Amino acid sequence: MIFSRSMASFTLVSAYAAAGLLAIIVLNLLRQLLFRNKTDPPLVFHWIPFLGSTVTYGMDPYAFFFSCRQKYGDIFTFILLGRKITVYLGIQGNEFILNGKLKDVNAEEIYSPLTTPVFGSDIVYDCPNSKLMEQKKFIKFGLTQAALESHVPLIEKEVLDYLKTSPNFKGTSGRVEITDAMAEITIFTAGRALQGEEVRKKLTAEFADLYHDLDRGFTPINFMLPWAPLPRNRKRDAAHARMREIYMDIINERRKNPDRETSDMIWNLMHCTYKNGQPLPDKEIAHMMITLLMAGQHSSSSISSWIMLRLASEPAVMEELYQEQITKLSPDGRTLPPLQYRDLDLLPLHQNLIKETLRLHLSIHSLMRKVKNPMPVPGTPYVVPADHVLLASPGVTALSDEYFPNASRWDPHRWENRVEKEDEEDIVDYGYGTVSKGTSSPYLPFGAGRHRCIGEKFAYVNLGVIVATMARHMKLFNVDGKKGVPATDYSSMFSGPSKPAIIGWERRFPEKS
């Protein structure tokens, strides 16, 4: 009898729950179909409120964007975990969002919950925009021409040492999970060039574990619940505290021994002062160094992996790279001297290969800004409400046949007769030196506007030296009859090749190994 009553109660509750869910879905559909405000951008149709288009967007953002553009045009809104995300695609969309006025759009409210626990307090998105612009200026002036020139031999040595000592490249030929290998190479090159000798010496097993635990803090759920007591968040917080301690120890040691100063990024930041006269606090220096390590390594690791995968899928291009170096750099047509900064400008195919891979494989597919005031969209009847989030996707123009014929094909040679010029009329100073707004171009691998990446020049130097060194010493190829490259993994905040991404390798000169 008791069992029967329990079952009846359960059935009744289930019926009420089902009816309630059905009512919510019906009301959601009616609102979409009957009550649309004509000044609102079109809303992507969805069945379930709150969830909206979260799944389809998360599985393949670019497929989602292109599909929606066919149905709704360049401007549309979709629901992402209860948030109203207004997407504006194309060059005009990039301009509207990435060069939006500070009073109208805000990046800090979007990214601070995600980045502050990883990078640290009082920097980047955890401070007023004016302070961030000063911090970007400090970093930018640490990336001087002389500094970039000095980085080339350091980066080349790190790559050569890795090829000689890593178990991934033991012997004269083999197979390698290339995303793991490039993650290690890029953290070593960036660590040595940007972080200084003390930090590079600390890139041991402990530092790798700390980096891994911090990196796992960049998970989509932390956009919504950065404080959630998840195991990965506890590890993230512990890793941040330990990494900050490491940098603080280095800074304190240098202050005790000023005669041993070396001209690297830590030295540069230790001598920086805000406009109000306050020296850059040591805690902020430590947090900025963590940011440099994390932010730069993500994109370099991803794009260098894609480069190696593309070269493995088309070995003939790898040979073209090698022959370009022989033609342009070899004194005798056989041997190659150590790389120098000026050599990179003599290798157009190397540069074009990097550009083309960046075009196809941007690691960040969505750039978001919180709307602070209603924003009329020029040339349209739409007004973006203040409770929306704006989303720009520069990768969409880079993947469009309108701007790049046969855009889905990887072709480094397409850049030989193409020049991407900065619009001199759009030069602006946001507080960290003059830059181009950049949004008039369909190719924006490093973003645009006040939040444009300041590490662009270093990224090209780092990738250029890595590619040139690999081409000198290695041959790459696909294995097991595989064609092309792996699919893109969009499950993390920074997209990259799906794993496992295994390719074959052999040394170009095995007798020298």
From Swiss-Prot:
Topology of this chain in the membrane: Single-pass membrane protein
Reactions catalysed: a 14alpha-methyl steroid + 3 reduced [NADPH--hemoprotein reductase] + 3 O2 = a Delta(14) steroid + formate + 3 oxidized [NADPH--hemoprotein reductase] + 4 H2O + 4 H(+); a 14alpha-methyl steroid + reduced [NADPH--hemoprotein reductase] + O2 = a 14alpha-hydroxymethyl steroid + oxidized [NADPH--hemoprotein reductase] + H2O + H(+); a 14alpha-hydroxymethyl steroid + reduced [NADPH--hemoprotein reductase] + O2 = a 14alpha-formyl steroid + oxidized [NADPH--hemoprotein reductase] + 2 H2O + H(+); a 14alpha-formyl steroid + reduced [NADPH--hemoprotein reductase] + O2 = a Delta(14) steroid + formate + oxidized [NADPH--hemoprotein reductase] + H2O + 2 H(+)
UniProt EC number: 1.14.14.154
Localization, UniProt: Endoplasmic reticulum membrane
Top-level lineage group: Eukaryota
GO cellular-component term (any): endoplasmic reticulum membrane
Inducing factors: Over-expressed in azole-resistant clinical isolates.
Pfam family, one: p450
Keyword Methyltransferase included in the entry's annotation: yes
SUPFAM superfamilies tied to this protein: Cytochrome P450
PROSITE patterns: CYTOCHROME_P450 (PS00086)
Pathway the protein contributes to: Steroid biosynthesis; sterol biosynthesis
Statement: the UniProt record of this protein carries the keyword Amino-acid biosynthesis: no
CDD domains, A to Z: CYP51-like
GO BP: methylation; sterol biosynthetic process
Residues modified by glycosylation: 37, 406
Keywords, comma-separated and alphabetical: Endoplasmic reticulum, Glycoprotein, Heme, Iron, Membrane, Metal-binding, Methyltransferase, Monooxygenase, Oxidoreductase, Transferase, Transmembrane, Transmembrane helix
Cofactor(s) the record lists: heme
InterPro entries: CYP450_sterol_14alpha_dmase, Cyt_P450, Cyt_P450_CS, Cyt_P450_E_grp-IV, Cyt_P450_sf
Gene3D superfamilies named among the record's database cross-references: Cytochrome P450
UniProt: heme binding residues: 453
Transmembrane segments: 10-30
Molecular function via GO: heme binding; iron ion binding; methyltransferase activity; sterol 14-demethylase activity
Function: Sterol 14alpha-demethylase, encoded by cyp51A, cyp51B and cyp51C, that plays a critical role in the third module of ergosterol biosynthesis pathway, being ergosterol the major sterol component in fungal membranes that participates in a variety of functions. The third module or late pathway involves the ergosterol synthesis itself through consecutive reactions that mainly occur in the endoplasmic reticulum (ER) membrane. In filamentous fungi, during the initial step of this module, lanosterol (lanosta-8,24-dien-3beta-ol) can be metabolized to eburicol.
Family, similarity comment: Belongs to the cytochrome P450 family.
Protein name, entry field: Sterol 14-alpha demethylase
